Structures are given as structure tokens and as C-alpha cells.
Amino acid sequence: MAPWTLWRCCQRVVGWVPVLFITFVVVWSYYAYVVELCVFTIFGNEENGKTVVYLVAFHLFFVMFVWSYWMTIFTSPASPSKEFYLSNSEKERYEKEFSQERQQEILRRAARALPIYTTSASKTIRYCEKCQLIKPDRAHHCSACDSCILKMDHHCPWVNNCVGFSNYKFFLLFLLYSLLYCLFVAATVLEYFIKFWTNELTDTRAKFHVLFLFFVSAMFFISVLSLFSYHCWLVGKNRTTIESFRAPTFSYGPDGNGFSLGCSKNWRQVFGDEKKYWLLPIFSSLGDGCSFPTRLVGMDPEQASVTNQNEYARSSGSNQPFPIKPLSESKNRLLDSESQWLENGAEEGIVKSGTNNHVTVAIEN
């Protein structure tokens, strides 16, 4: 077996250690709460009504937590579609060229029909040498998964999976139900934690589980709260974790808010338009993960006119780094109804706005 193959196998095995740790803690918490607290402690003191209420509520949070955690782990990260791969002839020409300018020229021609509106910091086409494809907007190569991931947020060791377009909603729900699960356990255990701590109750076996259960649930609640709050802020801004540290580069320069459509629309991009699915770990995110609508940038009429002329002149040249027409020309429901397509030639697209004198800096999905 080659050393690299052996290393990858070991890496995959070790990657499941954090997941097994979380699984062990969850299984133990289930036993400690249901058996030691509800059955032996609360039901043993003849508090039957409280036992039933606690068990029903606990299992509701437990099922939603396990469901969302399972979906986050076992939902395969979405990869770029075949349109973003170079053809055999393009790949052959690209590999034969040693000049970076010539290589970029090949990539620019290949990207003309793709919905790509961001570049690298050096204004070059974002190309993955390992996957041999042109990276869609917001996609990045994950070294742990060894593939390009659509709208990659981060690789999470606690789920042993990449968090991206296909499972980001599940990841957020996993954090939410983790918080609710830990909060419910800590709040309902607190009464008996105090009784055991003050020796009002003397069952030594249940005492250990109840005391430890309170500390563990409170600790996890505090740690997950900060992470969940941070990701709620990211969703409101329509950013990924990667984009929060390194803003995407558009034709006019880096812009951390380039994909922001407003807080409400940003949330709907992740959770979808159907509110009945928002709290369920069922995929309902909008879009295909390969292209995304961008915000409208306000300009005065003279500046907008000059910008339109410059964009038209650049699109006519052979060195245009951005595509002229996306894969799909269907109007995205997230954008304002004022924005519309105006076809100018066979492959030219200029987006125009009505009363607010806005100009889009990137074409929507």
C-alpha cells in the first residue's frame, strides 16, 4: 500500500473519533436523564405527572437533535456540476502551456458560458489544479475531503464532514437543537442537582449521574451558544466562515457583502420559502449551489452610465474574465422585481434597474 493511501486511510479512521465521542456523551445523557433522573429519582418519589411531562419533552428535543446531527454527518457535500470541468481538449491545451497568461486565457474562454462573477485576489479565474475544474462562486477545495465543495463553510471535525451548500441548514439545526437539548436538560436537572448537592436526596448512584449531567449540559450549552450565535450572524449577512475571513473578489474589488440581499432574503436562501420546513432537517435551501444572486449597488446616473459602457467594452474583448451569460436565465425570486434581463447581442447580458438607478455588479442565478 502506498504511503499516501495509508495516510488517507488513517485520516479517515481518526476523523470518526470526535463523532464517536459526541455519540458516547449523547447516549450516556439519555441513560442518565431517562433512567437515573426520571425513573429512579422523580418517579421513585411518586411524582408521576412531572415524570411524564419531562419524558415527553425530553424525547422531542432528543429526536430532533439526533435527526439533525445524523443529516449533517451523512449528507454528502455537493460538488460542482460537469459544466465547470474543462473539456479534454481544453485540459490538454492548459497542461501544455507553461505561461500563466496563456493558461488564464484558456480558462477565460472556458468560463464565458459559466455563472462565475468572482475571481481570486489577483483577478485570475479560480481554478482547482487537483479537481481540474473552474471553481464556482463560493466553492473551495477541502483538503480533508479531497474535493471541491459548493458554498463551502468549513470542515467540521465534530461531524466528520464538510459543511456546505447541501448540509448547511442541517448544521444550523444541529446547533439549535443542541442548544435546546442542553438547556432543557440543565433546567430540569437543576432542582435535583441542588437536592443532591445539599444531601436532601441520598441515592448515591443517581447522585453521580445527576450532578455530572448538569455540569456537562451547562458546559455544552455555553460553548454551542457562541458558535450558534456566530453562524446566525453569518446567515444574516449571507457569508460563509471562509468569506468572513477573506472577502470574495468581484469585478470592482473585494466585497464581504457582495452576496447579501437583506436579512430576510439571506435567511430564505438557507432555509427556503416554505416556513413549514424551516425547523425540520429536510433540504429546502434555494438555488443549485453553483451560482448565487448578488446585491444591488447604488450609483448615481452618470456613474451608472459610465459603468455600463465600460462593462460593454470589456465584454467585447477576448480578455473578459467574467462570463457573459449564466447557465440559467430564469429570474431569481430573491431579487427585486425591478431588475430584469436585457439581451444585447448573442452573448451579452446587462442588468438594468428601474426607479432607484441601481446597477448590478454581478448577474443573478
From Swiss-Prot:
Zn(2+) 1 binds at C128, C131, H141, C148. The record marks S29, Y181 as: Important for selectivity toward medium-length fatty acids. Zn(2+) 2 binds at C142, C145, H155, C162. Changing F171A: Loss of catalytic activity. The modification Phosphoserine is found at S305, S330, S339. Palmitoyltransferase that could catalyze the addition of palmitate onto various protein substrates. Catalyzes palmitoylation of Cys residues in the cytoplasmic C-terminus of EGFR, and modulates the duration of EGFR signaling by modulating palmitoylation-dependent EGFR internalization and degradation. Has a preference for acyl-CoA with C16 fatty acid chains. Can also utilize acyl-CoA with C14 and C18 fatty acid chains. May palmitoylate CALHM1 subunit of gustatory voltage-gated ion channels and modulate channel gating and kinetics. Autopalmitoylated (in vitro). This is Palmitoyltransferase ZDHHC20. Its EC number is 2.3.1.225, 2.3.1.-. GO terms for molecular function: palmitoyltransferase activity; protein-cysteine S-myristoyltransferase activity; protein-cysteine S-palmitoyltransferase activity; protein-cysteine S-stearoyltransferase activity; zinc ion binding. The DHHC domain is required for palmitoyltransferase activity. GO terms for cellular component: endoplasmic reticulum; endoplasmic reticulum membrane; endoplasmic reticulum-Golgi intermediate compartment membrane; Golgi apparatus; Golgi membrane; intracellular membrane-bounded organelle; membrane; perinuclear region of cytoplasm. Substrate binds at K135, H140, H141, C142, S143. The gene is ZDHHC20. It is a multi-pass membrane protein. The chain crosses the membrane at residues 15-35, 54-74, 170-190, 208-231. GO terms for biological process: peptidyl-L-cysteine S-palmitoylation; positive regulation by host of viral process; protein palmitoylation; protein targeting to membrane; synaptic vesicle maturation. The active site is at C156 (s-palmitoyl cysteine intermediate). Belongs to the DHHC palmitoyltransferase family.
